[in-house]
């Protein structure tokens, strides 16, 4: 028997990898500019929730993904700001063996999906420490957001139909 038949091809397909290396709080801010006066008003909050992601390549197959969560709450009657909470929850991930579209999906959907529970817990804790009523952010469907983004990109890059002259 020879080893020639057992030799691996020079360029063997790399196995897909997505591993968490580290999860951390990159930045956090909590402001309650109208305390304690705000507690004298009826609690009818208007909540503004913003979400964003950033990704940065740190090295070969190594990426930092940051999930930006911003919650601003004002009172319906007066418009006074109750609190503003901003959290940047980040993680370092090893990601490899993926196509470009799979990598984009991992960076904009799968990694943020792993980070969101940490950010949600931190927001809830900060709001609680401000002695406001509990705030439990609903889960986010990052896959749906990714698909919507891809649909928009596809629509924008589609050539516009030219009118035909007869």
From Swiss-Prot:
Task: Provide the GO biological process annotations.
Answer: protein folding; protein tetramerization; protein transport
Give one Pfam family, short name only. Answer: SecB
Q: Where does the record say this protein resides? A: Cytoplasm
Protein transport in keyword set:
yes
Top-level lineage group: Bacteria
Broad class of where this protein is predominantly found? cytoplasm
What GO terms are given for molecular function? unfolded protein binding
Give UniProt keywords alphabetically. Chaperone, Cytoplasm, Protein transport, Translocation, Transport
The reply on keyword Transport is yes
Q: Which InterPro entries match?
A: SecB, SecB-like_sf
The UniProt entry's GO CC annotations, sorted and at most eight, read:
cytoplasm
Complex formation? Homotetramer, a dimer of dimers. One homotetramer interacts with 1 SecA dimer.
Record's function text:
One of the proteins required for the normal export of preproteins out of the cell cytoplasm. It is a molecular chaperone that binds to a subset of precursor proteins, maintaining them in a translocation-competent state. It also specifically binds to its receptor SecA.
Instruction: State the family it belongs to.
Output: Belongs to the SecB family.
Q: Which HAMAP family match?
A: SecB
Report the protein name in the record: Protein-export protein SecB
Name its species.
Answer: Actinobacillus succinogenes (strain ATCC 55618 / DSM 22257 / CCUG 43843 / 130Z)
